């Protein structure tokens, strides 16, 4: 018997990260020493005080029970404190914050409560693949906004006609950006908020890489006056505190949207693990030196990869934040061809830019989540392919 699956199940695109994991595993099974720069899986370890809080929390009998649906008050208060001391934003923990199991959990809920079949969702291209996948599963119409290198890999919001904005139900922003590492200046966010108010759409800002900038930290969307009238922000603890495997984050901002996400999540999600919330509260409310140290470490790694590739002849975007390097393939190649060559001939795995939309088709994304020694080795291996570069750039 063949079981007929739902339209939703039939519409799910392949996961590009899972596919690359299989490709890397197959290469390693053949004996290749692969330096995997394809995935944003942090190689750090939560600092000692966060681990100590988690260990102590495991031994608390109260933490063997279900937690409050919205999140433990301690965690939500710590999230509010983080917004206050890091961004100067005052939030009500009871109505403007909600605990989630990482950014994708919050994104899925936000997409679900905002989009009906046929609704239009806009996002910059290149984009994090889940935006496309979630839109497709919900039957929404996608409006990619091409980001431009000359604009610092930001889209030109004013290039979109007013009648097109009138059709948009949701605008998704993501800065520091995955995959490009671009950051958005305050005036960009302010313009997005102005357009949302004028044309009646909501904004979701995916703030997964908060705190991880090269120089000046990316500002929160919620620092913009009136931003809370039109949108929410989704923050993850995965990258800031090297807690990717622990799964925690929060939704913040507009009370109506936060309430809708809560109601959806009550039925379709799960509470964040109790002791993870306790550890997360310690991370958020305490000193942020660990985050600054991580940002400095990633900046040093970024310099290794970016400068090494430039020395070989590649055009590399001067990314301002996040965990990735965004490099252009030579003129005669696509990003897919370049990534295949790097893996096949140098044992270096990177993701083709086409995984992130059409605009990135001639680019590759390299993650910085390997020790510096391995990054130096990756650049050296790629450099050995350089005799062909003059021909490829012709």
List each language-model region with its residue ranges.
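N-terminal small-domain helix-loop-helix segment of the aminotransferase-like
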Residues: 2-6, 10-102, 109, 283-286, ...
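Helix C-cap/helix->beta junction micro-motif
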Residues: 27-30, 138, 195-199, 312, ...
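Conserved core of the PLP fold type I
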Residues: 59, 63-194, 211-212, 218-224, ...
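PLP-dependent enzyme catalytic core of the Aspartate aminotransferase-like
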Residues: 81, 332, 341-351, 356-394
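Conserved glycine-rich beta-strand-loop-beta hairpin in the small C-terminal domain of fold type I
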Residues: 281, 296-306, 316-328, 360
